[in-house]
UniProtKB/Swiss-Prot annotation:
Coiled-coil regions, chain positions: none
Cellular compartments annotated: Cell membrane
GO annotation, cellular component aspect: plasma membrane
PANTHER family: INNER MEMBRANE PROTEIN (PTHR30287:SF1), MEMBRANE COMPONENT OF PREDICTED ABC SUPERFAMILY METABOLITE UPTAKE TRANSPORTER (PTHR30287)
Keywords, in A-Z order: Cell membrane, Membrane, Transmembrane, Transmembrane helix, Transport
Transmembrane segments: 15-35, 243-263, 301-321, 333-353, 381-401, 403-423, 453-473, 680-700, 734-754, 769-789
InterPro entries per the UniProt record, alphabetical: ABC3_permease_C, Membrane_comp_ABC_pdt, YbbP
Protein's name according to its UniProt entry: Uncharacterized ABC transporter permease YbbP
Keyword Cell membrane: yes
Taxonomic source organism: Escherichia coli (strain K12)
Domain of life (superkingdom): Bacteria
Primary localization class, coarse: membrane
Keyword check for Membrane: yes
Length: 804
């Protein structure tokens, strides 16, 4: 009986929309849940390889031994590293090297790539970067003097797992064993060194140790993991993750709305059937069995189809994201399935319980009186309760993210606008005198049922707003990535350029038709005072290390001025706005620096917005020309070259002390990552658009049912098919235009919060929204309305349906 009734009811368009909306909700949560779960497991494994540890502690001096012993007591593996710069010698040839001394456990995770393969820094031997070997004309098996120690060269170090990217690292790498550091005599009290301690273990061990350690850290010490990475790739991937979360949120919101509209419409369309069944003797228990059984079959079918679609989406996304994921991802846990099925159940209960209760409570009297509706769970109580429950569940699912609050803020603004603009529209229409008959009929229809008009306006506006949000943000992400990696980005850095080499280097590059980026002088100094107040004790990382300063007459293109005036004059400086906010520095304040030779001061006269994600030189402070002349300085520049290694070899021979840094591989990796992620985002746009179209169809279908009886009356009074179709077209076009206008205001509100607080984009009003949304809304709804209307007014079908 239940199966037969379900199969007969299955042909109802409303029930089909409910099934599709629930299926898409399951698919969205399952696909993103599975990918997130697998990526979290796989990337946590990969991230430890990028760091050669699960966590790291950085310090300018050796930490107490008790800290390391405590870590070992808790079951953590502990590794030590020490980095410093010192002079090395091959015979009488000197060369500054960046020394990295490691213990026997290094690397804790990941691979140290060497030539020959499989080498590790053993006591008495060193590994040299190929550039250092070339500069000193050395080969494997030779010896090199590092300070007071003479060590054997075991091979070349090609790639370190935890090397990172630093264009200001002036000297080539030399890797040695920590046991040989004392023999070199290079590290003395007061020497500038950096200690890094790597820790490995499970999350419980790491979290426990972190809670024990953090209260004891000093300002110059930093505890971090890979999630603190703020590089170009790290920030881009974070934005991509936020976009995927936003896609999931919008899909769920649209699915909830579509199920609510379609479920309500389906149950209303079955009031007469239930009333007839009751008059024929059907008991409450029998009807409950039929209705609940049918509902369970819809949920089961939605779970099966949604699960299949979700797994398909997961596989598509995994193929698209394959180049940016670890080679082998572990399987997902059961949690995504529980979340997906739980989401489906909660959505169905929240929006389906009241319509089904109303259906079950239908009175037999409705057979005689069409306006009899049971009074169950008044909307004035039910809607606020459902809204609060939905927000709490979404907050739990999204982790209280700013994404959720921004979208909800946009929805609230949109709801208020719908009320205000809707009433304004109705009042304007009431006063208008129209000559066109279809327009007059359309306007009279909208005025006759104001609450129905406002509810349709709200649903259409919500659909358009959420779709606009997604499409605009996707465009912003892609634009941002293209700005970050323009086609002519420099792929080589030249660093450690002496002042006397600048002119001959420019001539060399010009000879090879190379146009370099700006030449930046680099001076290392420590910020020691702000308005004559010492900065000691301040925990900001920028105050606990030497900063790279520069002077420029021309403002860098990627550093727009946000306050003050450019260029700085004598005894003035331009400061990065983020650091100024963190240190509470305002225009007119004085900052004091200690360089290698002397102390110097400057007044802050401008603040710049610095794009730290760009693979270009960036500086906290830019001085005017001549301000840093008393300090030792080197220079750096960058250029693009794609014509082979001949020029690069000639450059190395002619300027052996200049370091050449090839970032082409980094650019290629970032470009591939962003290309693949953008494809994955397109898949999510398709998913959200499908949900949006379902909501539009559901709402248009509801509108058509309300118009059905009126169409019969008009047709009986002699109205032609063309007039009816034109009337429907005009009515839906007006609804679509106003919905698009309201959606544009709501979308701008949400975008202002999302762009500024979540995606870290500068917010700018998008004029295209104000044109595209109203026009698209009018076009889409007139097409949907016209298509369904054409089916309604076709021949005798209109009367046949009415009679039925």
């Amino acid at each position: 009986m239940i199966a037969r009734w379900f199969w007969r009811e299955w042909r109802s368009p409303s029930l089909l929309i409910v099934w599709l909306a629930l299926s898409l909700a399951v698919a969205c949560v399952l696909a993103l849940g599975n990918i997130s779960d697998r990526m979290e497991k796989g990337l946590s494994q990969q991230s430890r390889e990028f760091m050669a540890g699960d966590r790291a502690l950085r310090s300018s001096r050796e930490v107490p031994q008790a800290w390391l012993e405590e870590a070992q007591k808790r079951g953590l593996k502990v590794g030590k590293q020490l980095t410093f710069a010192t002079m090395t010698f091959a015979g009488d040839t000197p060369q500054l090297a960046n020394v990295k001394a490691v213990d026997d456990i290094y690397p804790m995770y990941g691979d140290l790539q060497t030539n020959p393969p499989g080498l590790k820094p053993q006591a008495g031997s060193v590994l040299l970067a190929p550039r250092l070997m070339a500069l000193l004309n050395l080969k494997t098996g030779d010896t090199i003097d590092v300070g007071d120690a003479t060590l054997r060269i075991a091979g070349e170090v090609i790639q370190e797992p935890d090397s990172g990217f630093n264009p200001f690292q002036m000297a080539p790498r030399l890797m040695m064993n920590l046991a040989d550091v004392d023999k070199t005599g290079a590290v003395q009290p007061g020497s500038r060194v950096t200690w890094r301690y790597k820790f490995g273990g499970n999350e419980n061990q790491l979290d426990g140790y972190e809670k024990w350690l953090l209260p004891q850290l000093k300002p110059e010490q930093r505890w971090y993991g890979l999630e603190q990475d703020e590089g170009a790739l790290g920030r881009s991937m974070e934005r991509s993750q936020q976009f995927l979360l936003l896609s999931a949120l919008l899909t769920l919101l649209l699915a909830v709305a579509a199920v609510a509209v379609a479920m309500n419409h389906y149950c209303r369309s079955r009031y007469d059937l239930v009333a007839i069944l009751k008059t024929l003797g059907a008991g409450r228990a029998q009807l409950r069995k039929l209705i609940v059984g049918q509902w369970l079959m819809v949920l089961t079918l939605s779970a099966v189809t949604g699960g299949a679609i979700g797994l398909l989406f997961e596989n598509v996304l995994m193929v698209l994201l394959k180049p940016v994921l670890p080679a082998a991802l572990p399987p997902a846990s059961l949690w995504p399935w529980l979340w997906a099925l739980g989401t489906m159940t909660v959505i169905s209960l929240l929006v389906g319980l009241r319509p089904y209760r109303l259906l079950l409570a239908t009175q037999p009297l409705r057979v005689l009186r069409n306006d009899v509706v049971a009074n169950v769970w008044p909307l004035k109580f039910y809607l606020p309760i459902v809204s609060v429950v939905v927000v709490l569940l979404l907050a739990g699912l999204m982790g209280g993210s700013m994404l959720l609050w921004a979208v909800l803020a946009g929805a609230v603004v949109l709801a208020l606008l719908c009320g205000v603009l809707g009433w304004m529209l109705l009042n304007v229409l009431r006063r208008m005198t129209l000559k066109s008959l279809p327009l007059r009929l359309a306007v009279s229809r909208l005025l006759r049922q104001p609450w129905s008009t406002l509810s349709q306006l709200s649903a259409f506006s919500l659909s358009f707003m959420l779709l606009a949000l997604l499409l605009v943000l996707r465009g912003d992400l892609l634009d941002r990535w293209q700005q970050q990696l323009p086609p002519e980005s420099p792929n080589y850095f030249l660093i450690n350029i002496a002042t006397e080499q600048v002119a001959p280097l420019k001539a060399f590059l010009a000879e090879h038709q190379i146009v370099p980026e700006s030449f930046y002088p680099v001076v290392r100094a420590r910020l020691t005072a702000i308005n004559d107040k010492p900065t000691e004790g301040n925990e900001d990382e920028a105050l606990n290390r030497e900063l790279n300063l520069t002077w420029q007459n021309t403002r860098p293109d990627h550093n727009p001025i946000v306050a003050g005036n450019w260029p700085p004059k004598a005894d003035e400086v331009s400061m990065e706005e983020g650091l100024a906010k963190r240190l509470n520095v305002a225009l007119g304040d004085t900052v004091t620096f200690m360089g290698d030779t002397q102390e110097f001061r400057a007044k802050v006269t401008s603040l710049r917005k610095v794009d730290w994600e760009s693979l270009r030189p960036n500086f906290y402070f830019i001085f005017p020309e001549g301000a840093l002349d008393g300090q030792p300085q080197s220079w750096l520049t960058s250029f693009r070259w794609e014509n082979g290694n001949g020029m690069l070899t000639q450059l190395n021979r002619q300027f052996p002390t200049i370091s050449l840094l090839d970032i082409g591989a980094i650019l290629k990796q970032v470009g591939q990552v962003l290309e693949q992620v953008s494809r994955a985002l397109e898949v999510m746009v398709v998913l959200v658009t499908a949900c949006g179209m379902l909501l539009l169809l559901a709402q248009v279908q509801v509108g058509m049912r309300q118009r059905h009886q009126e169409l019969v009356v008009w047709r009986t009074l002699g109205a032609g098919k063309k007039l009816l179709r034109t009337t429907l077209w005009c009515e839906f076009a007006m609804l679509g235009f106003v919905s698009g206008l309201v959606a544009a205001i709501g979308a701008e509100t949400a975008l202002a919060v999302l762009q500024a607080k979540v995606f870290d984009f500068p917010w700018e009003p998008d004029w295209r929204l104000w044109i595209v949304l109203p026009c698209s809304g009018a076009l889409l709804l007139s097409l949907f309305g016209g298509w369904l209307g054409a089916r309604l007014v076709k021949g005798k079908a209109l009367f046949r349906q009415f009679a039925g």
